[in-house]
Protein backbone atom coordinates (compact mmCIF):
# COMPACT_ATOMS: atom_id res chain seq x y z
CA UNK A 1 0.00 0.00 0.00
CA UNK A 2 1.32 3.43 -0.86
CA UNK A 3 2.80 5.46 1.93
CA UNK A 4 1.30 8.84 2.73
CA UNK A 5 2.15 11.15 -0.15
CA UNK A 6 2.95 8.34 -2.61
CA UNK A 7 0.95 7.86 -5.77
CA UNK A 8 -1.57 5.05 -5.64
CA UNK A 9 -1.15 2.05 -7.93
CA UNK A 10 -4.42 1.58 -9.87
CA UNK A 11 -5.93 -1.90 -10.01
CA UNK A 12 -6.27 -3.62 -13.42
CA UNK A 13 -9.99 -2.76 -13.40
CA UNK A 14 -9.27 0.89 -12.65
CA UNK A 15 -6.66 0.97 -15.39
CA UNK A 16 -9.08 -0.43 -17.97
CA UNK A 17 -11.67 2.13 -16.89
CA UNK A 18 -9.11 4.92 -17.30
CA UNK A 19 -8.44 4.07 -20.94
CA UNK A 20 -12.17 3.66 -21.60
CA UNK A 21 -13.05 7.04 -20.12
CA UNK A 22 -10.23 8.74 -22.03
CA UNK A 23 -12.13 7.92 -25.23
CA UNK A 24 -15.05 10.02 -23.97
CA UNK A 25 -13.00 13.22 -23.78
CA UNK A 26 -11.19 15.44 -26.26
CA UNK A 27 -7.86 14.37 -27.76
CA UNK A 28 -8.21 10.64 -26.98
CA UNK A 29 -5.24 9.66 -29.18
CA UNK A 30 -2.84 11.98 -27.39
CA UNK A 31 -4.11 11.16 -23.91
CA UNK A 32 -4.04 7.41 -24.56
CA UNK A 33 -0.45 7.63 -25.79
CA UNK A 34 0.61 9.65 -22.74
CA UNK A 35 -0.90 7.20 -20.28
CA UNK A 36 0.34 4.13 -22.18
CA UNK A 37 3.88 5.52 -21.96
CA UNK A 38 3.40 6.08 -18.24
CA UNK A 39 2.07 2.57 -17.52
CA UNK A 40 4.11 0.56 -20.05
CA UNK A 41 7.49 2.33 -19.90
CA UNK A 42 7.35 3.91 -16.45
CA UNK A 43 8.62 7.28 -17.61
CA UNK A 44 8.63 10.19 -15.17
CA UNK A 45 6.28 13.04 -16.05
CA UNK A 46 9.17 15.34 -16.95
CA UNK A 47 10.58 12.66 -19.26
CA UNK A 48 7.24 12.38 -21.08
CA UNK A 49 7.02 16.17 -21.37
CA UNK A 50 10.48 16.34 -22.91
CA UNK A 51 10.01 13.54 -25.45
CA UNK A 52 10.69 14.47 -29.06
CA UNK A 53 9.73 12.72 -32.28
CA UNK A 54 13.26 11.39 -32.78
CA UNK A 55 13.06 9.36 -29.57
CA UNK A 56 9.93 7.54 -30.76
CA UNK A 57 10.15 7.20 -34.53
CA UNK A 58 11.99 7.85 -37.75
CA UNK A 59 10.12 10.38 -39.84
CA UNK A 60 9.79 9.91 -43.59
CA UNK A 61 10.24 12.64 -46.16
CA UNK A 62 7.66 15.38 -46.54
CA UNK A 63 5.58 14.74 -49.65
CA UNK A 64 3.14 17.10 -51.33
CA UNK A 65 -0.52 16.13 -51.01
CA UNK A 66 0.35 12.99 -49.06
CA UNK A 67 0.34 11.99 -45.42
CA UNK A 68 3.89 11.78 -44.09
CA UNK A 69 4.99 8.29 -43.17
CA UNK A 70 7.03 7.19 -40.17
CA UNK A 71 8.53 4.09 -38.58
CA UNK A 72 8.32 3.42 -34.86
CA UNK A 73 11.62 2.60 -33.19
CA UNK A 74 12.08 -0.78 -31.54
CA UNK A 75 13.91 0.86 -28.63
CA UNK A 76 13.45 4.29 -27.08
CA UNK A 77 16.64 5.96 -25.84
CA UNK A 78 16.18 8.53 -23.09
CA UNK A 79 19.06 11.01 -22.71
CA UNK A 80 20.36 11.59 -19.20
CA UNK A 81 19.39 15.25 -19.48
CA UNK A 82 15.70 14.30 -19.64
CA UNK A 83 15.77 12.83 -16.15
CA UNK A 84 16.96 16.17 -14.78
CA UNK A 85 13.60 17.72 -15.64
CA UNK A 86 12.47 20.62 -17.79
CA UNK A 87 15.30 22.94 -16.77
CA UNK A 88 17.53 20.83 -19.02
CA UNK A 89 15.78 22.42 -22.00
CA UNK A 90 14.52 25.57 -20.30
CA UNK A 91 10.83 24.64 -20.50
CA UNK A 92 9.94 25.06 -16.84
CA UNK A 93 8.66 28.52 -15.94
CA UNK A 94 7.93 27.64 -12.33
CA UNK A 95 10.47 28.61 -9.70
CA UNK A 96 11.59 25.71 -7.55
CA UNK A 97 10.15 25.96 -4.03
CA UNK A 98 11.74 23.90 -1.28
CA UNK A 99 9.35 22.08 1.02
CA UNK A 100 11.86 20.52 3.44
CA UNK A 101 15.52 20.82 4.36
CA UNK A 102 17.78 18.51 6.35
CA UNK A 103 20.96 19.00 8.36
CA UNK A 104 23.45 16.85 10.19
CA UNK A 105 23.59 17.38 13.96
CA UNK A 106 26.94 19.17 13.72
CA UNK A 107 25.73 21.39 10.89
CA UNK A 108 22.58 22.26 12.82
CA UNK A 109 24.61 23.22 15.92
CA UNK A 110 26.88 25.41 13.81
CA UNK A 111 23.92 27.21 12.22
CA UNK A 112 22.28 27.81 15.61
CA UNK A 113 25.46 29.46 16.87
CA UNK A 114 25.60 31.65 13.77
CA UNK A 115 22.01 32.76 14.29
CA UNK A 116 22.70 33.49 17.97
CA UNK A 117 25.63 35.73 17.03
CA UNK A 118 23.57 37.56 14.41
CA UNK A 119 20.74 38.08 16.89
CA UNK A 120 23.13 39.51 19.50
CA UNK A 121 24.44 41.91 16.86
CA UNK A 122 20.86 42.95 15.93
CA UNK A 123 21.56 41.89 12.35
CA UNK A 124 18.85 40.89 9.89
CA UNK A 125 18.31 37.14 9.71
CA UNK A 126 17.13 35.55 6.46
CA UNK A 127 16.32 31.84 6.92
CA UNK A 128 17.11 31.09 3.27
CA UNK A 129 20.74 32.03 3.87
CA UNK A 130 21.12 28.96 6.08
CA UNK A 131 19.52 26.38 3.78
CA UNK A 132 21.87 23.68 2.44
CA UNK A 133 22.62 23.67 -1.27
CA UNK A 134 20.07 21.94 -3.47
CA UNK A 135 21.37 18.55 -4.58
CA UNK A 136 21.53 18.30 -8.35
CA UNK A 137 20.05 15.10 -9.79
CA UNK A 138 22.72 13.46 -11.93
CA UNK A 139 20.37 11.77 -14.34
CA UNK A 140 20.96 8.47 -16.11
CA UNK A 141 20.32 7.59 -19.74
CA UNK A 142 18.51 4.35 -20.49
CA UNK A 143 17.19 2.25 -23.37
CA UNK A 144 13.66 0.84 -23.16
CA UNK A 145 12.25 -1.59 -25.76
CA UNK A 146 9.02 -0.47 -27.44
CA UNK A 147 7.55 -3.96 -27.64
CA UNK A 148 4.15 -3.75 -25.94
CA UNK A 149 1.39 -4.06 -28.57
CA UNK A 150 -1.03 -1.64 -26.89
CA UNK A 151 1.72 0.92 -26.45
CA UNK A 152 2.80 0.68 -30.09
CA UNK A 153 -0.80 0.99 -31.29
CA UNK A 154 -1.39 4.07 -29.12
CA UNK A 155 1.77 5.72 -30.41
CA UNK A 156 0.93 4.83 -34.01
CA UNK A 157 -2.61 6.24 -33.74
CA UNK A 158 -1.30 9.45 -32.22
CA UNK A 159 1.54 9.90 -34.72
CA UNK A 160 -0.83 9.39 -37.66
CA UNK A 161 -3.07 12.13 -36.28
CA UNK A 162 -0.18 14.53 -35.59
CA UNK A 163 1.27 14.08 -39.05
CA UNK A 164 -2.13 14.58 -40.65
CA UNK A 165 -2.45 17.87 -38.79
CA UNK A 166 1.09 19.02 -39.57
CA UNK A 167 3.33 17.22 -42.04
CA UNK A 168 6.29 19.56 -41.55
CA UNK A 169 7.23 18.46 -38.03
CA UNK A 170 10.93 18.00 -37.36
CA UNK A 171 12.64 15.15 -35.47
CA UNK A 172 13.49 17.59 -32.67
CA UNK A 173 9.91 18.86 -32.23
CA UNK A 174 8.10 17.96 -28.99
CA UNK A 175 6.09 14.75 -29.26
CA UNK A 176 3.21 16.01 -27.14
CA UNK A 177 1.80 19.53 -27.43
CA UNK A 178 -0.93 21.43 -25.60
CA UNK A 179 -4.15 22.67 -27.17
CA UNK A 180 -2.31 25.91 -27.96
CA UNK A 181 0.34 23.98 -29.87
CA UNK A 182 3.23 24.53 -27.49
CA UNK A 183 5.24 21.94 -25.56
CA UNK A 184 4.06 20.75 -22.16
CA UNK A 185 5.95 21.88 -19.11
CA UNK A 186 6.32 19.09 -16.53
CA UNK A 187 3.98 20.93 -14.15
CA UNK A 188 1.26 21.31 -16.79
CA UNK A 189 1.51 17.67 -17.87
CA UNK A 190 1.52 16.54 -14.24
CA UNK A 191 -1.76 18.37 -13.65
CA UNK A 192 -3.25 16.98 -16.86
CA UNK A 193 -2.35 13.38 -16.00
CA UNK A 194 -3.78 13.81 -12.50
CA UNK A 195 -6.98 15.17 -14.08
CA UNK A 196 -7.35 12.04 -16.21
CA UNK A 197 -6.66 9.67 -13.32
CA UNK A 198 -8.58 11.32 -10.49
CA UNK A 199 -11.33 13.36 -12.12
CA UNK A 200 -12.07 11.40 -15.29
CA UNK A 201 -11.44 7.86 -14.00
CA UNK A 202 -12.18 8.51 -10.31
CA UNK A 203 -9.03 6.76 -9.05
CA UNK A 204 -8.53 8.00 -5.52
CA UNK A 205 -5.05 9.32 -4.58
CA UNK A 206 -3.69 8.68 -8.08
CA UNK A 207 -1.15 11.03 -9.64
CA UNK A 208 1.12 11.35 -12.65
CA UNK A 209 3.48 8.94 -10.84
CA UNK A 210 0.87 6.16 -10.60
CA UNK A 211 1.73 4.55 -13.94
CA UNK A 212 5.42 4.48 -13.09
CA UNK A 213 4.76 2.96 -9.66
CA UNK A 214 2.39 0.42 -11.19
CA UNK A 215 5.01 -0.78 -13.68
CA UNK A 216 7.90 -1.05 -11.22
CA UNK A 217 5.69 -2.73 -8.60
CA UNK A 218 4.53 -5.24 -11.25
CA UNK A 219 8.12 -5.99 -12.28
CA UNK A 220 9.18 -6.70 -8.69
CA UNK A 221 6.11 -8.38 -7.20
CA UNK A 222 4.25 -10.10 -10.05
CA UNK A 223 7.07 -10.83 -12.47
CA UNK A 224 9.52 -11.52 -9.62
CA UNK A 225 12.35 -9.79 -11.47
CA UNK A 226 15.44 -8.62 -9.64
CA UNK A 227 15.81 -5.14 -8.21
CA UNK A 228 18.57 -4.65 -10.81
CA UNK A 229 16.05 -5.10 -13.63
CA UNK A 230 13.58 -2.73 -11.98
CA UNK A 231 16.37 -0.21 -11.39
CA UNK A 232 17.31 -0.28 -15.08
CA UNK A 233 13.71 0.27 -16.19
CA UNK A 234 13.17 3.07 -13.68
CA UNK A 235 16.45 4.79 -14.45
CA UNK A 236 17.41 5.04 -10.78
CA UNK A 237 21.05 5.94 -10.16
CA UNK A 238 20.97 4.33 -6.71
CA UNK A 239 19.37 0.90 -6.12
CA UNK A 240 18.20 2.08 -2.69
CA UNK A 241 15.64 4.22 -4.51
CA UNK A 242 14.27 1.13 -6.25
CA UNK A 243 14.07 -0.80 -2.95
CA UNK A 244 11.15 1.44 -1.96
CA UNK A 245 9.03 -0.40 -4.53
CA UNK A 246 9.64 -3.73 -2.76
CA UNK A 247 6.84 -2.83 -0.36
CA UNK A 248 3.81 -5.09 -1.00
CA UNK A 249 1.20 -3.54 -3.29
CA UNK A 250 -2.21 -2.49 -2.01
CA UNK A 251 -4.03 -5.45 -3.57
CA UNK A 252 -1.82 -7.96 -1.68
CA UNK A 253 -2.50 -6.21 1.62
CA UNK A 254 -6.24 -6.10 0.88
CA UNK A 255 -6.21 -9.82 0.04
CA UNK A 256 -4.39 -10.62 3.28
CA UNK A 257 -6.88 -8.67 5.37
CA UNK A 258 -9.79 -10.27 3.54
CA UNK A 259 -8.50 -13.81 4.24
CA UNK A 260 -8.19 -13.49 8.01
CA UNK A 261 -9.32 -16.77 9.58
Task: Annotate each PLM feature.
Residues 82-84, 234-259:
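Catalytic-site neighborhood detector that most strongly recognizes the C-terminal catalytic loop/helix
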Residues 50-145:
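Conserved tyrosine-mediated DNA breakage-rejoining catalytic core shared by Y-recombinases
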Residues 12-41, 45:
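Basic, Lys/Arg- and aromatic-enriched nucleic-acid-binding interface segment
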Amino acid sequence: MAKSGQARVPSPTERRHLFEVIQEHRHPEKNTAIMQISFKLGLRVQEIALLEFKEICRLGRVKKCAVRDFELHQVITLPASYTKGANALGRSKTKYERKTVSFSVDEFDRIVRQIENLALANADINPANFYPDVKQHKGKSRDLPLIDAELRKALTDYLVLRLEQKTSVKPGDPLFVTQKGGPYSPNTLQEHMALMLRDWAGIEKASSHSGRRALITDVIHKQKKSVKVAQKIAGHVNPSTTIIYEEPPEEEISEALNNIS
